[in-house]
Amino acid sequence: YDGSVEIAVSQVTWEDNGSTPVLSSKGNIQLGAASFTDPAIYMDKVVGIDGTDKKVGYLLYMGFNIDYDDELMAAFERFRQQNVTDLILDLRYNNGGDVLSSAVLGTLVAGNDYKGQVYAHTTFNEDRTEAGEGGDYKIGVKETVERIYEPLETALQHAVGLKKIYVLVSQTTASASEMVINGLRGLDIEVNLIGQTTNGKNVGMEGVMRSFYNHEFLLYPVTFYVENAKGFRDYSTGFVPDVEIDDSAIYPGEFGTMEDQLGYIALVWIKSGKKPELQASSLTRGGGSPMKPFGDLWDIRPIRPMGGAVMRPRTDE
């Protein structure tokens, strides 16, 4: 781990037909060892669409972690200041995280018109339910079933308040990500899905510390269901996309542009106002782009996402 390796670097370009990759050698480089923390927000930007007055916010969000909700709110503040008309939420690679962060994201999308409405409800087993456990997470309300969480209230100041969003999804999209889809649909916000059927994890976990054989173990058993304001929780087989396309086997284009196939479909949908009907020729990398940049709004900083689950804090009981 303390040494370095020599690797060959190649560049991938595309022939004029937009579908045939060309690999060009760029020589060798020495790659040394270093520490890297995967960011939760890979990209946030605002783009315009030629021939329209649309301003589209794009967020590539990789993991729900309460330690970085301030950065999430900062991204939406940039969206708000530029008066975005539409939102593309890219959750293709987001497999979950903290319930509270999911509620913050829901608040940032929904805004003041939905303040106080139920975003998500947690349901435990019969014994814990009879004991009064379980409860609601509400839009813009800091009091939750877990604890008081100030960012839920603060998020209203940065919310974009949209009635319709576009979400890019895959089989990896799970748990807290699916909670966003389900929670917003429970508020009758239109959530249009593009990609693959999601993972189908409609349950959550809690951290519990236990001692065995003089060792401490932190366990995360599945302990609760997550449902929306309408009581819907039956998505164990995943959410089926409105436009189904598998981009997992291709080399991705630049995120948030027409070079990314799922992003392309979302932008075409936003521009036309109609769900695209896919044809083979429409999924190549050639042709003109109806999109123009509306600013270079990258927000990349080393942060650590909590992935793989809908999670609540650990207990030592």
Describe the predicted segments one by one.
Residues Y1-V84:
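C-terminal, low-ordered peptide segments at domain boundaries
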Residues D53-D86, N95-E317:
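C-terminal "post-core" interaction segments
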Residues R92:
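Flexible loop residues that form catalytic
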